[in-house]
């Protein structure tokens, strides 16, 4: 019998893994927020610093311009056609980032595959310079491997 996957644990592991990847790349501390986004009260009025901490999936260093949304989903997405799942993730990332005046940065861990990074196209000034590997455009978002983005 196939073992049931605990989605909460899988998401927590992905967030920890992503925090380690970003910490290593930037040499600055990144950490899990520790409260699932579903449990974060959107209606509660938080002060600016608390809102900065609890809005994203990761606590980012001071001055980091991105709001990091982390997903761990075992589904591939066809970037040539509309994807309700990807649209849902992008809306959440964009809404959260807008609420704290940051740039949305979606990182998607695929089961037994690498990480995918998704950023708004308007913030990618020169795709030829930034992305040395394969990238794609989905609506107004640039999609590439996280490894390619972080170099």
Task: Tell what function each PLM region has.
Residues 1-151:
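Catalytic phosphate/metal-binding cores of nucleic-acid and nucleotide-processing enzymes, i.e., regions
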């Amino acid at each position: 019998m196939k073992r049931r996957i605990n989605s909460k644990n899988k998401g927590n592991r992905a967030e920890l893994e992503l925090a380690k990847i970003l910490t290593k790349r930037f040499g600055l501390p990144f950490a899990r927020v520790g409260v699932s986004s579903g449990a974060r009260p959107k209606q509660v009025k938080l002060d600016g610093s608390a809102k900065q901490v609890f809005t994203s999936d990761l606590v980012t260093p001071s001055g980091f311009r991105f709001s990091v949304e982390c997903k761990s989903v075992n589904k591939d997405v066809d970037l040539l056609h509309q994807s309700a799942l990807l649209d849902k993730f992008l809306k959440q990332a964009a809404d959260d980032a807008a609420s704290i005046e940051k740039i949305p940065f979606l990182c998607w861990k695929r089961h037994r595959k690498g990480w995918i990074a998704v950023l708004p196209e308007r913030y990618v000034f020169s795709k030829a310079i930034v992305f040395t590997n394969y990238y794609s455009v989905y609506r107004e978002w640039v999609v590439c491997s996280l490894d390619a983005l972080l170099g």
